[in-house]
Amino acid sequence: MLSGVTDDGSTQSGSLIDEIVREGARRMNAHDIVQEPDEHARFAAYLDQLQQVAKADEVDLISHVLSDPDQTMAQSAVLRHLDRRAADLHLDPAYAKWSKAMAQAVIGHSFLTRRLHEWSLFRAITLTLSWRPDDLLAASDWLQLKAAVESSTAAIEILAEDGRTKRIRNTATVSLKRQSQR
């Protein structure tokens, strides 16, 4: 398990990234390590650590993952974490506090910021809170497709008519038909 993190991002036994890599390597057998590039080992280790991180340490760990020199890999690991946590929390009142903390952690990473915003929009649609149809229509294909499958009738109707892609429109149309058969 990770040891305490100091202000400069290091731990008692070295940098947090080095410690995560060592932890990931420890969990893999030697044959896998030889064949797998470093960024793959770090990615697996990051996912493992993000899966297990305590709520109080989540922002710090995300910040450290995002400081990895391989930004594509680091952001991918954080994206998976955000999607997993948001899927678990979006119907819960705790989501608001969590999403604010995550927004601070991902400042400067536009794709991650947008994904958090889209999770908040999905939450608003699902819980029938205030939301604007134009925001849904301007959202990514990812959110439109997700909303076409598992959101409010109002959102699904909008997407059946004006969804960005044929796939989104067709998925929304099928969802509406299923809802009417219930």
Stretch-by-stretch model annotation:
Residues 2-182:
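Alpha-helical scaffold segments
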